[in-house]
Amino acid sequence: MIQLQRVSKQYDKGTIALRDINLFIDKGEFVYLIGPSGSGKSTLMKLLYREEMQNRGTIRVGDFNLNKLKERQVPHLRRTVGVVFQDFKLLPKLNVYENIAYALEVTGESGRTIKARVKEVLELVGLAHKAKSYPNQLSGGEQQRVAIARAIANRPAILIADEPTGNLDPETAMGIHRVLESIHRRGTTILMGTHNDTLVDHFQHRVVVLEGGRIVRDDRKGDYHESH
């Protein structure tokens, strides 16, 4: 599902973000990507949806070989990969329904499909009653639920979540993670970057640890928690 072979990333000013990364994530896995700030977590995730490109190595995401991906194919890749950010990135002048519908409109879905999909994902994240609310009328946790709903509206096979609970209080963070668990149970592969040890310890999925741009640990389900 996701495969990185000897992947390295260096920025123009000489900063090395990733060094010789080898990582395989199977279909249906839930994987935590953890490590200190500057360890390369966000860079690795950006490579997977072609926000950035590696300098060396091979990346495969689903059916896409990113080394051979043409610019016109990037939108097709991004329908396969949903992305959730720490800062929500909702459009302030659109209500909840419209924020999610917009993600479907740009891919050319029909009005009937859009209506059904928005209803489906709002029910999944527990916000069907907030469809007509605007972002400034929502709590931080509610805004993140909308962002998650938008990310899965196209039914992506993979969901990348970069610090999705970073700005939230512990109780709200736990609620957001339970939403991600529900999505995972539907068969979606999830890669989640986080600093939240409480969530990692509680839910016990596979843990990949980055330090200095290198993978220093890759613990299968339960192993990290037994040795942590």
What would you call each of these model-derived segments?
Residues G57-N65:
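Conserved ABC transporter NBD signature motif
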Residues A153-A157:
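A short, proline-enriched helix->beta-strand linker immediately N-terminal to the Walker B motif
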Residues L159-D162:
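Catalytic Walker B motif of ABC-type/P-loop ATPase nucleotide-binding domains
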Residues Y134-L138, E142:
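Conserved ABC ATPase signature
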Residues L94-A101:
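Short coil-to-helix segment of the ABC ATPase nucleotide-binding domain corresponding to the Q-loop/switch region
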Residues Y49:
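Helix-to-loop junction immediately C-terminal to a conserved catalytic motif
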Residues P170-T172:
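Helix N-cap at the start of a conserved alpha-helix in ABC-type nucleotide-binding domains
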